[in-house]
Structure formats: structure tokens, C-alpha cells
Regions:
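Glycine-rich beta-strand-turn "strand-cap" elements at beta-sheet edges
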Residues: 2, 40-46, 74-97
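Short, glycine- and small/hydrophobic-rich beta-strand elements in well-ordered beta-sheets
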Residues: 26-51
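An amphipathic, aromatic/His-enriched active-site/gating alpha helix that lines ligand/cofactor pockets
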Residues: 28-36, 55-89
């Protein structure tokens, strides 16, 4: 399984639009093959920061997600409204028995 964790900080002015864009991206991504989980949350300690959590079946599914045109459009929109650079970390994971 592949886990993606990311975050983006924005301004109070841009937060509603960025949250709406993020939810649209999450809902669309959940329909993609290999997407096990995709969510966005508002950081409890910084309400202008959105935190993303994703689980993908494998690296191939994640790479396919990155090549969906709407994913590129989303990242471009996020970058335009971000304060600083968005953060994204990708991990290979397996369950602990």
C-alpha cells in the first residue's frame, strides 16, 4: 500500500475556495482505480492549513492518479492560493500484525 500525506497553508481569504477545490479533488480521486482512501482535513491548530491523507493500492495506481489532468489542474490551483510551498510525502506501507 502507498500512503500520501500532504498539507498546504493558505490565507483566511482563500480558505473557502481552496477547501471547495480540495473536496472536489477528493471526491473525484476516490473514484479512481486503486484509491483506497482520500481525505482532506482542516488542521485543528492552524485553521488556514489543509491536511491531506491518501491510501493507494500500489505505486502504479498513484502514478496513474498523478497523470489525470484534473490532478495537475488541482495542484496548480493549490499552488496559486498557497502561502509557501505545499508539502507532499509518499510512503510505502504494510500492515503490522
Amino acid at each position: 500500500m502507498i500512503i500520501v500525506w500532504g498539507s498546504v497553508e493558505t490565507t483566511a481569504e482563500h480558505l473557502p475556495q481552496l477547501l471547495a477545490l480540495s473536496l472536489e479533488h477528493v471526491y473525484r480521486s476516490r473514484e479512481e482505480p486503486g484509491c483506497l482512501r482520500h481525505s482532506v482535513h482542516i488542521d485543528a491548530e492552524n485553521p488556514n492549513r489543509l491536511v491531506f491523507y491518501e491510501e493507494w493500492q500500489d505505486q502504479a495506481a498513484l502514478q496513474a492518479h498523478f497523470h489525470v489532468p484534473e490532478s495537475s489542474d488541482f495542484m496548480r490551483s493549490v499552488s496559486e492560493k498557497a502561502v509557501g510551498a505545499p508539502v507532499m510525502k509518499v510512503y510505502a506501507a504494510s500492515p503490522v500484525e
